[in-house]
Amino acid sequence: MNKFYPVLLMIFVFILFSLNTIAQTKFPQSPEKPDTFKVTNTINLEYKYVASINEQIQNGTFIPADPNEFKRQGPPKRMRANKVVPGKGLPKGDDPLVDFNLTKIKKQTREPILTFQTTNVTSTPSDPTGEVGRDYYLASWNSSFRFFNLDGSPATPAASLSSLFGPNESGDPIVLYDGEADRYVISSMGSSSLNFAVSVSNDPVNDGWHVYNAASNQFPTGGQFPDYPKYSIWSDGYYCTTNTGGDNLFVLEREKILIGDSSATLQSFDTPSMVQSGFASAQILDIVDDNHPEAGNATLVYLQDDSWGGVSYDHIKLWTVNVDWNNPANSSISNPTELATTAFNSVFDGGNFSNLQQPSGSDIDAVQATIMNQAQFRKFATHNSAVFNFVVDTDGTAGELAGIRWYELRQDGDGQPWTIFQEGTYIAPDGRHAFMGSMSMDLQGNIGMGYSSVSTSESVSLRYTGRYAADQLGEMTLEEGLITQSSANSNSFRYSDYAHLSVDPTNDKQFWFVGEYFSPNRSNMVGVFQIAADAAYDTGVVSVDSPVTGTLTDSESVTVSIFNYGENDISNFDVSFQVDGGAVVTET
């Protein structure tokens, strides 16, 4: 268990420290009793078996990734400016959850355990996604995918998504690892449909794929392009949200898909009372590990900004989805529950998509009005937790400083009401923007978050931070870590579109994050980092608490805080220290 221990030390040194603290404000929740709405459509999915990558290579049908690929798009995604009301909404000043005193001491962050590049492409943006499984890391981008061994070495050649889905493939992939089933999942858009594949076994390199498609002439979007699809795993289905009018939530029949049953179906819903700003990307909570909740009561989450027309105060909306595969008439989605939040401003540049300055080139898209990939769910012995984030403008002046507003929700048990356990806004050091976040929780409840960062003097970089479960609520308490720094700038305002962080199922501790950077072409880099300790006993000094200012005398009482990074509780331990190369002193 992680705990702080105040320790009094007698030392001879000059120290100047200034520590500020920020209190978290609790806000009342305002749940509404939900009414339910029925499923809109049910369709049969088209099924085919597709051979493994190794089989395709052997029989000559393998379609390699095109290094010069350009996305085969329908209507370009994220091109409609957000519909905001100028001057409307709170806060009128800086983000109230930001601690702008970045000199505050943070806990030490470990260096990345592993970094490796998954692709170097010319497509814009690269759409990085990846999930770590028990035996492989599955990476995908734009219109291609590849398996890697867990040491970062390639396990297969890079393959075109067409090798799974054929010519009806339009990119925007999302990949998943279904921990309970020990299977790998690959998805992409079709021209006006969805493509979905799950590995036949836990060996996706040598065994084949169950591939499903929602036929274009049946897909319930009225011919609309299924823009910006985001997938999640829940106990009773594979869930997908899209940026479409009308039906924008789709559920695929997980139980049948896992066994390659050709009678698998898809159900679709129109999300009630979701206020949009012109673009919308809500997400169903995705199960982090193999510990699934009871079937049913999947939760859909989306932000509601009072800068948008039709929203009177900043809040989070939650919908509950229940699917009955035997009798679709019983399937339903609830009216939303509303959770009041601390005021935030998610609008950049009046809702346009050229936002964040680089050292040169176009201002890049902050990806506003979006629950970032993915909203994650984890069961613990005493509660369930959900974590998610979205980008906000933390600067209350005419300038802009992108930060990441993040949340942990909790419920007492499966199907129980959600409440806000903690909320925070993270900003990067040195005046850099922090955006394009992806976050999750490990087995101890520690939160890890990867993100992108950029400024007028520094090109895009991929970075990470996090917090221990026992830390002060609402703060990312770990120092910022660096995964990779770009050597060039983006030549387009389109950047990344999303990133992806997953948790290693072999130890339930390591966070695997993938994002876009420039080397000098658009490239995707994976960074692996860990917060939880591997040692049973591991302590370290994290702050000097008193005195915080002034000059010390020849003999002075100094109080420091020591943090238990280890897995076990400790007490009555010795503390040793050394000042300016002097003798080592031990306090007992």
Question: Model regions: which residues?
Answer:
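Detector for intrinsically disordered, low-structure N-terminal pre-sequences
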Residues: P6, F12-F14, K38, Y49, ...
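Extracellular/luminal regions of secreted and cell-surface proteins that mediate adhesion/ECM remodeling
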Residues: D534-T588
